[in-house]
Regions:
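Bacterial N-terminal signal peptides that target proteins for export
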Residues: 1-8
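Bacterial N-terminal signal peptides
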Residues: 8-16
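Conserved functional micro-motifs across diverse proteins
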Residues: 22-235
Length: 235
């Protein structure tokens, strides 16, 4: 099945680069580097504020529009979905296995429970109600709803947990919060998720207004890209 995924990757990559080159010719002042995760990843699929990456073990998708609208603010919110792939044993993902790498290459851990309870994040929650993108796109085998409960809105009946069990049938979704020293800045970030045998580094860029305008024209619909990547092998 991998060769079919790789064929899809090549087509998306060529089309994306061609589009970017055309745009750069028209607006040469805008320069955006293609991110290098530094780890083996079969594919990174990009929508405007949605990023997804996977390898032979696991799949992670994120939505970060709220973070991109929070320039200068101290707290970052990211929506994350994750699962493990077929023929991979169930895996217990713990909160200390998730972190963000900032543009200056510093590592930012997930906000702990005490830190989350001590701050008022109602503005982020309100922003998320109008500025979120759907990330409910998973490989076909992951069809059972699953909550990533590292955080829960204060006052809600939901509880916060330190871990979540992933399996190839579970499509797990939840919010992540990080305290960013010095506030959120423009530039290249990575969401790092450590699985049992591998690390996935999902790239996401906090875009300037010019970058958003340029790149928004070049990213296809994320759902179509995911469906193409995980399309069953033809017999």
């Amino acid at each position: 099945m991998q060769k079919y995924w790789l064929a899809g990757i090549a087509a998306v990559a060529v089309a994306g680069l061609a589009g970017l080159q055309a745009e750069r010719q028209e607006k040469p002042k805008v320069q955006v580097q293609i991110p290098d995760p530094g780890v083996p990843q079969i594919m990174t699929m990009e929508g405007k504020f949605v990023r997804a990456a996977y390898n032979n073990e696991a799949y992670v998708i994120i939505g970060y529009q709220v973070a991109n609208r929070s320039i200068g603010e101290e707290y970052m919110m990211i929506d994350m979905g994750t699962t493990v792939l077929d023929n991979v044993p169930a895996y217990v993902l713990k909160r200390d296995k998730i972190a963000v790498t900032a543009p200056d290459n510093t590592t930012i851990p997930l906000l702990d429970h005490e830190g989350y309870r001590s701050v008022n994040l109602s503005a982020l929650d309100a922003r998320a109600k109008v500025q979120r993108d759907s990330i409910n796109y998973f490989p076909p085998m992951a069809s059972q709803a699953c909550r990533v409960g590292f955080f829960a809105e204060l006052g809600s009946p939901a509880r916060m947990w330190d871990e979540v069990e992933l399996s190839n049938r579970r499509a797990c979704l939840g919010r992540l919060f990080f305290k960013v020293p010095g506030g959120i800045k423009h530039g290249q970030y990575f969401l790092n998720v450590q699985f049992e045998k591998s690390l996935l580094r999902v790239p996401f860029r906090i875009l300037t207004a010019d970058e958003e305008k340029l790149l928004g024209k070049n990213y296809g619909d994320i759902r179509k890209q995911v469906q193409e990547a995980f399309k069953p092998k033809k017999k």
